[in-house]
Amino acid sequence: MTLPSAASSHHRADAFYRRWQRLNDWLAQHREFWQPAPFADPSPAWTKNWPALADRVARLSDSDCVQWDDDPVALAEWVAGALPSFREFGELTGIQPLAVEFADQNTLPEVRATDMPGRKRLQAGAFASAIQPLKHNVLDWCCGKGHLARTLAPLCGGDVTGFEWNATLVDDGNRLAGKFGDAVTLQCQDVMAENLTMPPDAHGVALHACGDLHRRLMRKVAGEGLPRVSVSPCCYHLTEALDYQPLSRRVRASKNGLELTRNELRLAVRETVTAPKRVREQTRRISRWRLGFDGLQRQLRGVDAYLPVPSHPTRLTNGDFATFCRWAAGNRGLELPGDTDFGVWERHGERRRQEVRRHELVRHLFRRPLELWVVLDYSMFLEEQGYNVRLGTFCERQLTPRNLLIDAEKRSVDC
């Protein structure tokens, strides 16, 4: 959803708000599909309220699940066969790409992309292309080793600075910049520090800064009236606040606005399209074990309720189900009977994994709507602070599902 540059700030802000309101109402209408977590709730309410849809979902094959996961719009159309309100999905979530015609030539050559994973190199190149031209000094926010900063340096006529709190990454990044002759300076800086000083005339950029970090950048840029900010947000749930705190006045004033918890925000970033096959297989195995143990603990406790188990030690990943169960039981203070049939419970876990996989297909349809709900709030905030905002995608979903870009330029006085 990009808006023409000629559109007035008033019309842009109104368009963002109308889009946000539609998403808000649609999400509220469909709470039963996205609020319960199938992993913890074997029988979410929607499976009883919409039995025709539940039956269709239960009959999906594994290959169907893979196909639908890769095409949310087509999945929504399929779900609409049982629940017509899902036909709005495509219109609600459609968003235009920002200009990325020269992504290849703006990407760091592989020979200069030391310590830079291939996908990150391509993401940085696409991001750089989408924010051309660069007219100001650039500040790479939470820059790590400065991969984005080094990508932008040849395209920028001004200074390129990076802020990063990890001193080791700063040292490594400055060595890389020196090795390849990049006009980049990284500084060891906690961006959440109260006394943070921003470089003058800075264009703040952030590629996949998390939660409070990207929110801090937008507030800091707006508060100091800096000329531009370009953000691809990520991990919206990584905040100190337990519930989502809207940035824009219009969202805060809305009487029917959703009140999202951190856990609900986490749903927006639960996608694995970029995970290697080995990681996906490992995830399936651990899910089977956790769901198998969940069935076992419900029987042992005589309580039909999910019992959270913390992250397991890495050493267990390549072990077996019985070892995992003994660790989980010990962690939760449960005693496993000596005659526990682990084979029965592992098979139970696989049945539940298949069920969860299908129920999550429906729940995952709400990832993009939730993400857009948040990003539209950010966009309205920046419009309210005197910026012209472009909102769109900077790359294809297959490169990264976190492909939204907010690009905001300070309005001139006569606008």
Language model features with spans:
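Conserved SAM-binding motif I beta-strand of class I
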Residues: 159-164
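Conserved class I S-adenosyl-L-methionine
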Residues: 136-142
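Conserved SAM-binding loop of SAM-dependent methyltransferases across substrates and taxa
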Residues: 145-157
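Class I SAM-dependent methyltransferase "Motif I" SAM/SAH-binding loop
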Residues: 118, 142-146
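Conserved SAM-binding strand-loop segment of SAM-dependent methyltransferases
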Residues: 181-191
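Conserved SAM-binding loop
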Residues: 173-174
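Class I S-adenosyl-L-methionine
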Residues: 2-52, 192, 198-415
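Conserved Class I S-adenosyl-L-methionine-dependent methyltransferase catalytic core
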Residues: 41-132
